[in-house]
Swiss-Prot record:
GO biological process, one term: RNA splicing
Feature: compositional bias, Basic residues: 190-259, 372-388
This protein's UniProt keywords: Isopeptide bond, mRNA processing, mRNA splicing, Nucleus, Phosphoprotein, Spliceosome, Ubl conjugation
InterPro entries: Nucleotide-bd_a/b_plait_sf, RBD_domain_sf, RRM_dom, SREK1_RRM2
Species of provenance: Homo sapiens
Name of the protein in its database record: Splicing regulatory glutamine/lysine-rich protein 1
Location in or out of the cell: Nucleus
GO molecular function, one term: RNA binding
Gene name linked to the record: SREK1
Length: 508
């Protein structure tokens, strides 16, 4: 049986051993009911299984269905081996796991069967006495936590480590055996004790034996030296000399072999130390590399963060610049609007001044007023004469038609006014068109247009003055014959009245 760690109790299925190895008989543990051992009982399938939790791994559902909870166990007497042997009678057991605190009087366990059909049989043991307590058996809601299975990579690493250890041991053994094999050929007859020492592979035993052999060798050499002295005193024979030389050779070979063993062991130990140091250095280098990599990653992250910050700052600066440009544009637009307003005001002032000048130029001269007064006086005379003519006989119509055909100054004045209005409208339209073109054109063209406007205004003023002067001359010329006609009419009227009287008399 495999030994169990205290408090753990994860137990695989061992080779079947007799129950006497546990020291507890099944009769003392508890009586198994006959119904549980009978596989043909229909009532066993009717035991309902509890519903599983929602967060259960679907790969472990089969394991949970095959596990059983066993409670009310005596923590001092019951072991996993006893539970395994007890539940083997029901079916094939895969794992047994002891759980709970060992210091408490009661513990519980989980038993996983190989087949799900053995679970209802195990549930039939509920209430059976196990030792001095009745068992509490029920379905399990959890699967047994098993040790992680070895991956092929981990297994390969373990094999490599084991093979390295085996090779080191083989090299150590071969180094220890090689000098002993050479000595055994020289020593024939089993005189050397190093051969027996080489068979013992433990370092402690070999070390102790070496100490003993050294002490024995010293005592023997001391005794031999004494015996040699005695022999020299007694007799010096060639046979004794040969034995002494052989012994010397043997002692030298033994010491030489021991020195070689020590040297080989020391070399092996030094090699192992060097290897361990190299491994430690490699580990330290790997750690330093990892640290450098982490530092490099951190530096890269810091650089990226700084770049992002710089980009954000540049974006903010660009936004501020755009805002400033927009403000400057708005200011320029406002300035342009103010300039346009001032220009419009100047234009309106110029137009008003032009109109005032035109009105002043349109006012008739004194000669025109005098002619008007003469006309009004002539009209009054006509009215008086017409009144008198109503009393007197009517005059001929031919003379009146002649007088009406002469152009009157009122009609001429109206035509002049219409022409002036048309000219004003044309000039205003031109000014509006020029104002629109002035807005589109640049500031350089504004000065040129102002000069053109001034020149056109002067020309218009001169043009307006010329027709006014011509109109006044025409009025004066027309007034002079009118006065002559009036004079003629005065004389003619008298004649007409006489003729009218003659015609009336004839009619009567």
């Amino acid at each position: 049986m495999t030994s169990l760690m205290p408090g753990a109790g994860l137990l695989p299925i061992p080779t079947p051993n007799p129950l006497t190895t546990l020291g507890v008989s099944l009769s003392s543990l508890g009586a198994i009911p006959a119904a549980a051992l009978d596989p043909n009982i229909a009532t066993l399938g009717e035991i309902p299984q509890p519903p599983l939790m929602g967060n259960v791994d679907p790969s472990k559902i089969d394991e949970i269905r095959r596990t059983v909870y066993v409670g009310n166990l005596n923590s001092q007497t019951t072991t996993a081996d006893q539970l395994l042997e007890f539940f083997k009678q029901v079916g094939e057991v895969k794992f047994v796991r002891m759980a709970g605190d060992e210091t408490q009087p009661t513990r519980f366990a989980f038993v996983e069967f190989a087949d799900q059909n053995s679970v209802p049989r195990a549930l039939a043991f509920n209430g059976v006495m196990f030792g001095d307590r009745p068992l509490k058996i029920n379905h399990s809601n959890n699967a047994i936590v098993k040790p992680p299975e070895m991956t092929p990579q981990a297994a390969a690493k373990e094999l490599e480590e084991v093979m390295k250890r085996v090779r080191e041991a083989q090299s150590f053994i071969s180094a220890a055996i090689e000098p002993e094999s050479g000595k055994s050929n020289e020593r024939k007859g089993g005189r050397s004790r190093s051969h027996t020492r080489s068979k013992s592979r433990s370092s402690s035993k070999s070390h102790s034996r070496r100490k003993r052999s050294q002490s024995k060798h010293r005592s023997r050499s001391h005794n031999r030296s004494r015996s040699r002295q005695k022999d020299r005193r007694r007799s010096k024979s060639p046979h004794k000399k040969r034995s002494k030389s052989r012994e010397r050779r043997k002692s030298r070979s033994r010491s030489h072999s021991r020195d070689k063993r020590k040297d080989t062991r020391e070399k092996i130990k030094e090699k192992e130390r060097v290897k361990e140091k190299d491994r430690e250095k490699e580990r330290e280098r790997e750690k330093e590399r990892e640290k450098e990599k982490e530092r490099g990653k951190n530096k890269d992250r810091d650089k990226e963060r700084e770049k992002d910050r710089e980009k954000d700052k540049e974006k903010d600066r660009e936004r501020e610049r755009e805002k400033e440009h927009e403000k400057d544009r708005d200011k320029e637009k406002e300035k342009e609007q103010d300039k346009e307003k001032e220009r419009e005001k100047d234009r309106s002032k110029e137009i008003d001044e032009k109109r005032k000048k035109d009105k002043k130029s349109r006012t008739p001269p004194r000669s025109y007023n005098a002619s008007r007064r003469s006309r009004s006086s002539s009209r009054e005379r006509r009215r008086r004469r017409s009144r008198s003519s109503s009393r007197s006989p009517r005059t001929s119509k031919t003379i009146k038609r002649k007088s009406s055909r002469s152009p009157s100054p009122r009609s001429r004045n109206k035509k002049d006014k219409k022409r002036e209005k048309e000219r004003d409208h044309i000039s205003e339209r031109r000014e509006r068109e020029r104002s629109t073109s002035m807005r589109k054109s640049s500031n350089d063209r504004d000065g040129k247009e102002k000069l053109e406007k001034n020149s056109t205004s002067l020309k218009e003023k001169e043009h307006n003055k010329e027709p006014d002067s011509s109109v006044s001359k025409e009025v004066d010329d027309k007034d002079a014959p009118r006065t002559e006609e009036n004079k003629i009419q005065h004389n003619g009227n008298c004649q007409l009245n006489e003729e009218n009287l003659s015609t009336k008399t004839e009619a009567v």
